[in-house]
Amino acid sequence: MIKDYKVSIAIPIALLILSILLIGFKGIPKSIDITGGTEITIKVNENMDITPLKESLNGIAEVKKLESADGYYIVIRCKNEDVDIVKQKIKEFFHVDSLDKLNYSEKTIGATLSSKFFEEGFKAVGFAFMFMAIVVYLYFRNPVPSGAIILSALSDIIMALGAMSLLGIELSSATIAALLMVIGYSVDSDILLTTRVLKRLTKSFDETVKEAMKTGLTMTLTTITAMLILLIVVKLFIPVADILANIATVLILALIADIINTWLLNAGILKYYITEYRAKKI
């Protein structure tokens, strides 16, 4: 399974460093949940050309069109201070004197509330990760296997954030919730692998990892499949439910990262621990 643990560890570490560089230099786009602002959603029955609206709101607001089974949706996002200008441009585009004549909805989040949510959201992620790390250490009571699990889980989160930066997925209330879910999803296969390896020392390392991989990959791929189905359904039938789409996307990215980190990084560290570190102690 793992011929050279150094190569096995190096691949996910390289991806981890790349993710950190992406986050540091490119950043992660933030939704109005984080930055504060107004989102106006207008339902229309025909496929309209929104290029004139985009041009009139260039530099003021973000405009996009979504298609679903029951029609089309035009979504406009802007800063709270620009909302009056944006509404005026919308009225001019649709040739109406009031937005009440349109099938529209409006969501506004203040800057203070959004910054507070951002702060509390990441506190929740931090505390969840810390308590997970404590539980893992108390269970295994060994710094090397415990550290491997914690490093793998941390790498899952950072790689997911790096993928969000690369793909332009916004950091929002939904994606922060997804990151919280990632902590739970990411450690199960790591704990499965570590428990199997440490409790079956009479078997060869590669044989034990292969057995654990069958169960672990089945669990992970089942979840990825479920999230893919959710993502496809949302994109095709309810595109305005972008919260569900964002959660599904982040979980898929994180679970792909988890496959790499569990079966290369964690397994590589465990092979070093069993074949070299532990052997020297004995």
Curated annotation (Swiss-Prot):
Gene: secF
Pfam families, per the entry: Sec_GG (PF07549), SecD_SecF_C (PF02355)
UniProt KW ATP-binding keyword: no
Family: Belongs to the SecD/SecF family. SecF subfamily.
Single Gene Ontology BP annotation: protein targeting
Official protein name in the record: Protein-export membrane protein SecF
Bilayer disposition of the protein: Multi-pass membrane protein
GO annotation, cellular component aspect: plasma membrane
SUPFAM superfamilies tied to this protein: Multidrug efflux transporter AcrB transmembrane domain
Subunit composition and interactions: Part of the protein translocation apparatus. Forms a complex with SecD.
Location of this chain's protein in the cell: Cell membrane
Main location: membrane
Spans through the membrane: 9-29, 120-140, 149-169, 174-194, 214-234, 236-256
Keywords for this protein: Cell membrane, Membrane, Protein transport, Translocation, Transmembrane, Transmembrane helix, Transport
Domain of life: Archaea
NCBIfam families (alphabetical): PRK08578.1-1, PRK08578.2-1
